[in-house]
Amino acid sequence: MSTALLDAVVKKNRVRLIPFMLALYVLAFLDRSNIGFAKQTYQIDTGLSNEAYALGAGIFFVVYAFLGVPANLLMRKLGARTWIGTTTLLWGFLSAAMAWADTEAKFLIVRTLLRAAEAGFFPGMIYLTSQWFPQRNRASIMGLFYMGAPLALTLGSPLSGALLEMHGFMGHPGWFWMFVIEGLLAVGAGVFTFFWLDDTPEQARFLSKQEKTLLINQLASEEQQKVTSRLSDALRNGRVWQLAIIYLTIQVAVYGLIFFLPTQVAALLGTKVGFTASVVTAIPWVAALFGTWLIPRYSDKTGERRNVAALTLLAAGIGIGLSGLLSPVMAIVALCVAAIGFIAVQPVFWTMPTQLLSGTALAAGIGFVNLFGAVGGFIAPILRVKAETLFASDAAGLLTLAAVAVIGSLIIFTLRVNRTVAQTDVAHH
């Protein structure tokens, strides 16, 4: 009876929270990656150099690295609704402000402020998931959330491409309208957050008293099985550092490809970045949608975290590397494999810290791991450009990213993860 009721509660939470979280992630990812679509014409119009573009794409992550931990602790203190709603409003306005960043200095300043506003969003979403869903459901729940990335790049690619075609409307370039319109969408979502989100299950307006009690008791029982709830213990735990390094390698693969993908696809097609290239750019993200649905569900069903994550990241590395060596059609196929790999690995990966940590340690630990991811995002475009310049080859940059992803997969294989927890949970499903 309690198992059936708990499943019903999880379903209610999923219906209430996942579409909301997914929509926010779509907007966040779109605002974060739309600079890739603007790159070609934006650089021509503003005179922005390749080095400044790479620095701007990378510096976006520096502030994030420093603010991730305190942002998550602030969310724990202030409440999810206030924190997520406020930060979403801020990043929406700042994303729109990119439309007026027509010099290198303005570009770097706005990108830095935008990342500061976004710093608490993603780790906050991971923490929010741990407060609303039992351990046995988290990979598939995170998989649904992570579909926001391929959705943003599937729907957002044609959207961004179409907005770029507005060049000349009211005397402004296409990238101006892309930044303004996509930024204001996030502003609207921030306002909606204040009316929709509850801070904790105890405050949930859509759950009965019995449902709240059952969920709270289930989550409390899982907390008792975790290694630590203190931040100091978390930072002394070797597995936390392993997770942080792994996440760095994942983000190198992700952002080393995403920031340059529209340009890479346009080069494969022999055209400029516009609507046609943007539609083709969406193909890998359509593939990633299916992978992000299936792979985390398989992980939840089997209770297998480590091997699923390692093999998925390995596939991403192989796909990235081959995309620079094959014919245009096969290169698109390789990019599909890469996108499936580096998107689908992340929801499986994030079950590991939520299985290991609890309380304040979990909030700060997620921020700590995400800090390393921010470092990965910072160095990724710089690493790719440096490799391309050093070897005078676009393929060299892709092979460098691939090598980092393969190293990450090998580290995952060495990680000790308590598979029994997931298996036990599945057995009770």
UniProtKB/Swiss-Prot annotation:
A GO-annotated cellular component: plasma membrane
A Pfam family this chain is assigned to: MFS_1
Transmembrane regions: 17-37, 55-75, 82-102, 144-164, 175-195, 243-263, 275-295, 325-345, 362-382, 395-415
Record InterPro entries: MFS, MFS_dom, MFS_trans_sf
Spans within the Cytoplasmic topological domain: 1-16, 76-81, 165-174, 264-274, 346-361, 416-429
Keywords attached to this entry: Cell inner membrane, Cell membrane, Membrane, Transmembrane, Transmembrane helix, Transport
Lipid biosynthesis as UniProt keyword: no
Signal sequence range: none
Membrane topology: Multi-pass membrane protein
An MF annotation (GO) of this entry: transmembrane transporter activity
Residue ranges annotated as Periplasmic topological domain: 38-54, 103-143, 196-242, 296-324, 383-394
Location in the cell: Cell inner membrane
Superkingdom in the source lineage: Bacteria
Note: Part of the rhmRDTA operon involved in L-rhamnonate utilization.
Membership in a protein family: Belongs to the major facilitator superfamily. Phthalate permease family.
Protein name from the UniProt record: Inner membrane transport protein RhmT
Species annotation: Escherichia coli (strain K12)
